[in-house]
Amino acid sequence: MSITKLAPAAFDLHQPFPPSGDQPAAIAKLIEGIQSGKTAQTLLGATGTGKTYTMANVIASVQRPALILSHNKTLAAQLYGEFKEFFPNNAVHYFVSYYDYYQPEAYIPQRDVYIEKDSSINEEIDRLRLATTSSLVSRRDVVIVASVSSIYGLGSPDDYRQLVVDLHQGEQTRRDHLLLKFVDLQYQRNDIQFERGKFRVRGDSIELWPSYEEFAYRIEMWGDEIEKISLIKPTSGETIKTVEHLYIYPCKHFVMPEDRIQRAIRLLREELTQQLEIFQSQGKLLEAQRLSARTKFDLEMLAEVGHCPGIENYSRPLSGKEPGATPDTLYDFFPKDFITFVDESHVTVPQVRAMYAGDRSRKITLVEHGFRLPCALDNRPLKFDEWEERTGQICFVSATPSDYELERTGGEVVEQIIRPTGLLDPEVEIVSARGQVTHLLEQVRIRAERDERVLVTALTKRLAEDLATYFQEQGVKCRWLHSELNAFERVDLLQELRAGQFDCLVGVNLLREGLDLPEVSLVAILDADKEGFLRSETSLIQTIGRAARNANSRVILYADKVTDSMQMAIDETERRRVIQMEYNAKHGIVPKTVRKSIRKGIDTEAANHKESTRKAQDSGEAIYITIEYVDKLEQEMLAAAEDLEFERAARLRDRVLQLKEHIGKPLSEVEIVDEKSAGKSGGRGRGRRGAKKKGASKGTKIPRPKRG
C-alpha cells in the first residue's frame, strides 16, 4: 500500500512508565508494519497486557492522526480517558451517537402501523462531536475515540471548511456583516439567555459561545474594525486571554450554502413527480396521496426556513451527490494518512458489517408505502466495503480475533500475552448451577470483607435487576448495569464500583470487552452452560478477562455440564496462564494487583460543562415563579405520568405544590425539591426509554390503547 506523505503530527506522549512485558516487541512490530505499508495488522493482546498503552506508543512513534474505533459508548469513554492521560497536550476527542434514546421512523405493513421518529439528544455529547470535527479541520495531532456511529452521514467536510469564519485583530468588517456570517454558520442570536450555539450583542461588543467549546469569544469592534478578540468565561464574562487570530467553525455538522438548498428543492420536486407517476401507474393511489402531501409540506418548510422535520432523508440532494453515492462521514474529515485501530475487533467489525442491511430494509418499506422519496435510501451508513476503503492502514486489536481479522492479515498476529505487572490469567472453577445464587451470595460477602469487588453476568436484563434487588435485601451493596442506562450513567456506575460505593455489579452483555476494573477479584458467570451468543467461547474468554487485573482473581462458572465453548475458553485461559507463569519464573516476577487512580471520566467533564452552561444562563435575567411557570411544570408532570415515569411525576407534583406557595418570588430564593431521574441503581428503570429530554424531537408517539 502506498502511503501519502504529509507533515508529521506533533504528538507528545506522557509515559508514566516504560513499556514492559510483551509491549516493546509488539510496539516495534506494529510500527514496522505501518512504515512498510502493510494494509492490515492484528494485535492479539490478552486482557490487562496494556493494549491501549501499546496503541498510544505506536501513534506517538508514527506521528500520524489516529481513529480508535470501539463497539460501545462505555468502552469508548474509558479509552477516551486513557488517551487523554497519554496525550495531555494533544487533541483527544470523543465521538459517539448523541442519542440517549432513538426510535427510528418505521412502517409495519402487516398491521398498518406507522411509527414516527422519536429521539432524545444528549447536548453534551453533541458538543464533543462538534469539537471532534473542528479539531480535524484545524490540526494534525488528533486522536479520535469513536463508536460505530462514525459510519453514519455527517455532512460535507468541504462545505464545513468553506464556511469557517477567519477573524483577525485589526480586520476591517461591518458589524452587521459579521452577524450575518454567524447566522450562516447556524448560530442563533439571543441577547438574554447565553448558551452554547448562541451569540449576543452588547453595543460594539459581540459575544459568541461556539457549539464545540467550553469557553466563549468576545469580539470588540471600533467602528468597522475588529479592535480586540478575547476568550472569556461564559459564566462571569472574565477574560481568559486575548488572541490576534481566531477561527469560528459551524454550529452544526450539516451546513451548506443557500443556493444549494434551492437546487435541492428543484431536484426533489422532479423526483416527487417521477415517484407519483410510478405509484399511479401501479394503482397505489393512497401511497401517492401520502407521499405528495408529506413531501410538499417538507419542501415548503425548506424553502421558507431552510430546514424541516426529517431533513436527513433529503441529505443526498442537499449535498449535491449522485444517487447511490457514498455519504460523507467522519472518515472524510481525516487527512489521507490517518491510521485506524479497531478495538475489540471481534465485536466491532460485525457491528459495522450489519448496519447497512438493517437500515436499508427499514427504509425500503417506507419508500414502497409512500412515506419517503427514494432519495431517503441514500441517507445511510457506509457499506462494509466502503468502510474498508476509508480506513486506510488498519490495526485490529482483540484478545479473541475472529476469522475476518486473520484473513485480512494472512493469519499473522502480533501477540501480547505477558502483562507488565506479572499478573496471570485467573483460575477458573466450575460450580453446579443448582443453588448458584446462595453460593454466589456467600462469595460476594467474602470479597466485600476484603474490600474487593465482584462482577456477575446474567442472561437477561430482568434477571440482572432481580438478582441485584435480592442481594440488596440480603444486606449486600449491589447494583445492576445494562442498556437502559445512558452512556454517562454507565461510566458513573463503574467508577462508583471502583470507589467502593458498592461491592457487586450485575450485568448482561456490557461486562465484557475492555472494562478496566483492577479492584474486581471475582467474576461469576451464571448459567454458563446455556450455549449461545452470551455464552460462546469468545464471550466467555472476554468475561473471564475482567478478573485478570487482580492478583487474587478467580472466575466461577455456574454450570451442570461442560459445553464445548466452556472447555475451549478454559483451555485457552490455561494456555496463556502457563506462558505467563513460565515468563514470571524466568524473570523472577511476583504478580501484583494493578493500582490505578480513578480518573476523571468524560461524564465528569460533561457534567462540569453542563453546570457552567446553567450558570451562564442564570447570569442573565432572574427567573421568577409565575403562574405560567407552574403550569409548565404541571404539563411536565402529566407527560412523565403518561411515560410511566411515576417517581419523577410524583417529585414534579411535590414541586408544583411547593412553588404555588411562592408565586412572584425569584426561583433562586426557593429551595427546590430534588428532581433527579430514578433508575440508576436498583430500580426497574422502566419508562426511561420514552423520556423526553432537552433536544428531543417532536415526533408523535403511537397512542396506547385505552383499557376497556
UniProtKB/Swiss-Prot annotation:
Answer whether the UniProt record assigns the keyword Lipid biosynthesis to this protein. Answer: no
Q: Which GO terms describe its biological process?
A: nucleotide-excision repair, DNA damage recognition; SOS response
Q: Where is the Helicase ATP-binding domain?
A: 32-419
The short motif Beta-hairpin is annotated over 98-121
> Which portions of the chain have biased composition (kind: Basic residues)?
683-708
| Alphabetical UniProt keywords | ATP-binding, Cytoplasm, DNA damage, DNA excision, DNA repair, Excision nuclease, Nucleotide-binding, SOS response
Q: Where are the transmembrane segments?
A: none
According to the entry, every stretch annotated as the UVR domain falls at 627-662
Q: Does the keyword DNA-binding apply?
A: no
Q: Where in the cell is it found?
A: Cytoplasm
Region (Disordered), start-end ranges:
668-708
Where is each Helicase C-terminal domain found? 436-598
Annotated binding of ATP, by residue: 45-52
An example Gene Ontology molecular-function term: ATP binding
Q: Which domain of life is it from?
A: Bacteria
For this protein, the record's PROSITE patterns field holds: HELICASE_ATP_BIND_1, HELICASE_CTER, UVR
Q: Which GO terms describe its cellular component?
A: cytoplasm; excinuclease repair complex
Domain observations: The beta-hairpin motif is involved in DNA binding.
Q: Which family does it belong to?
A: Belongs to the UvrB family.
Q: How the protein assembles, per its UniProt entry?
A: Forms a heterotetramer with UvrA during the search for lesions. Interacts with UvrC in an incision complex.
Q: What does this protein do?
A: The UvrABC repair system catalyzes the recognition and processing of DNA lesions. A damage recognition complex composed of 2 UvrA and 2 UvrB subunits scans DNA for abnormalities. Upon binding of the UvrA(2)B(2) complex to a putative damaged site, the DNA wraps around one UvrB monomer. DNA wrap is dependent on ATP binding by UvrB and probably causes local melting of the DNA helix, facilitating insertion of UvrB beta-hairpin between the DNA strands. Then UvrB probes one DNA strand for the presence of a lesion.
Q: What is the protein name for this chain?
A: UvrABC system protein B
